[in-house]
Amino acid sequence: MIRTKISAENLNLFYGDFHALKDINISMGERQVTALIGPSGCGKSTFLRCLNRMNDIIPTCRVQGKLMFEDSEIYHPDTDVVALRKRVGMVFQAPNPFPKSVYENVAYAPKLHGLKDKARLDEIVETSLRQAALWDEVKDRLHKPALGLSGGQQQRLCIARALAIQPEVLLMDEPTSALDPISTLKIEELIRELKQYYTIVIVTHNMQQAARISDKTAFFLVGDLVEFDDTEVIFTNPKDQRTEDYITGRFG
């Protein structure tokens, strides 16, 4: 029995008068990869940003309904957003390393949370870089600028940076869209490895990628969650005609 990690019940989100998410109901399992697919503007990235309240930075944004992280309500007035984001990490579309050394990029968040012990920081940096399949490539250049890494290495560094505070959930917003095919393959292999330890939610425009790496797939269209099922079902026997039309390239 797979334990539910994140669930939404009649979740609605508005940007001013614009209804961006409409009555979303979904349950995402622990240590599974859930892919969010759909055409541009369908609400998939908006939904992803709800999961660690990144939408809070938009003044006109308001949320109705229930969004749960295990037994805690994500949008409850008493929710500690900093603590939430420690448990729910995020990797963005374009690699965005800080203009610091490789080491300082990974050590940044643990230091921010008050960790000062050098030996412990060293351990976290190495462990995180190993988990991100980057350690062997950067172990001899830890104190050199992160911006000197290739695009694929920078994105894996950003994953290591997110892992450094030991989150339970990792959100990925099109993490390979700016990368070449070889770097994309490495990130996909990494995602398959990481799901042993983390719950992963990924937004992707790449149908083949969703089919390759995810356990569950959610198809969004103009703010509606049209269909959510095992990835194999979504791609081979979808229940909704709109899902089939999108997957087969009839629109999108």
Curated annotation (Swiss-Prot):
GO cellular component, one term: plasma membrane
Protein family membership: Belongs to the ABC transporter superfamily. Phosphate importer (TC 3.A.1.7) family.
Name used for this protein in its record: Phosphate import ATP-binding protein PstB
Manganese is among the record's keywords: no
UniProt organism field: Heliobacterium mobile
Domain ABC transporter intervals: 6-247
InterPro entries in UniProt: AAA+_ATPase, ABC_transporter-like_ATP-bd, ABC_transporter-like_CS, P-loop_NTPase, PstB-like
SMART domains noted in UniProt: AAA
Main location: membrane
Enzyme class: translocase
EC number of the protein: 7.3.2.1
Name of the coding gene: pstB
Domain of life of the organism encoding this protein: Bacteria
Entry keywords, A to Z: ATP-binding, Cell membrane, Membrane, Nucleotide-binding, Phosphate transport, Translocase, Transport
Subunit note: The complex is composed of two ATP-binding proteins (PstB), two transmembrane proteins (PstC and PstA) and a solute-binding protein (PstS).
Location(s) in or outside the cell: Cell membrane
Catalytic activity field: phosphate(out) + ATP + H2O = ADP + 2 phosphate(in) + H(+)
GO molecular function, one term: ATP hydrolysis activity
Topology of this chain in the membrane: Peripheral membrane protein
Record: residues binding ATP: G38, P39, S40, G41, C42, G43, K44, S45
